[in-house]
């Protein structure tokens, strides 16, 4: 069993039960899924850029991403509906915990001038969004093979009803929030 999942079951669940006075163990918030999204704006002019983004996302997440396409045509961006403009991957279960563990313990500390992640990035429904400026913080990415520094969005979807519950859940799991 994954290290983070074990921690969730043994330490986090009892702590949340006592703090928020839940009646049943099923009320305790848990992480439902993690969605990693990489928008590749230059895929319009350079379709090869998307291939490398998909490859990198596969390495980071450990599963094949879905290519996202434009919903509408936007003339200003020379964009037609249906053109591929990004990639996203949804992690659940074992892989989700593996990724979160890796993110918290290895990748985030490698960010330059890292002082913790923002406390304000909750959406009011108990989900947390985190933007990453460069894919090089992940240990699987080889610095020499990167042709362009790309960022990504990581959305952590929890079953928490409020931001406060979600923040407590992530803090107990070891998410380094700013002081």
Swiss-Prot record:
One of its GO terms (biological process) is translation. It holds the Pfam family Ribosomal_L5. PROSITE patterns: RIBOSOMAL_L5. One of its GO terms (cellular component) is ribonucleoprotein complex. GO terms for molecular function: rRNA binding; structural constituent of ribosome; tRNA binding. Signal peptide: none annotated. Keywords: Ribonucleoprotein, Ribosomal protein, RNA-binding, rRNA-binding, tRNA-binding. HAMAP family: Ribosomal_uL5_B. Part of the 50S ribosomal subunit; part of the 5S rRNA/L5/L18/L25 subcomplex. Contacts the 5S rRNA and the P site tRNA. Forms a bridge to the 30S subunit in the 70S ribosome. This is one of the proteins that bind and probably mediate the attachment of the 5S RNA into the large ribosomal subunit, where it forms part of the central protuberance. In the 70S ribosome it contacts protein S13 of the 30S subunit (bridge B1b), connecting the 2 subunits; this bridge is implicated in subunit movement. Contacts the P site tRNA; the 5S rRNA and some of its associated proteins might help stabilize positioning of ribosome-bound tRNAs. Belongs to the universal ribosomal protein uL5 family. This is Large ribosomal subunit protein uL5. It comes from Geobacillus sp. (strain WCH70).
């Amino acid at each position: 069993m994954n290290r983070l999942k074990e921690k969730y079951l043994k330490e986090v669940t009892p702590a949340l039960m006592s703090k928020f006075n839940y009646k049943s163990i099923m009320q305790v918030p848990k992480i439902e899924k993690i969605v990693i999204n990489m928008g590749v704006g230059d895929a319009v002019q350079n379709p090869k850029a998307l291939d490398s983004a998909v490859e990198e996302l596969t390495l980071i997440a450990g599963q094949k991403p879905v290519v996202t396409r434009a919903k509408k045509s936007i003339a200003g961006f020379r964009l037609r509906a249906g053109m591929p403009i990004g990639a996203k991957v949804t992690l659940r279960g074992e892989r989700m915990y593996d990724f979160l563990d890796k993110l918290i313990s290895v990748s985030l500390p490698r960010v330059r001038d890292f002082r913790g992640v923002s406390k304000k990035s909750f959406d009011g429904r108990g989900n947390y969004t985190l933007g990453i400026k460069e894919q090089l913080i992940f240990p699987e990415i080889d610095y020499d093979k990167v042709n362009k520094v790309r960022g990504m969005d990581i959305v952590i979807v929890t079953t928490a009803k409020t931001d406060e519950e979600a923040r407590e859940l992530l803090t107990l799991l070891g998410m380094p929030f700013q002081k």
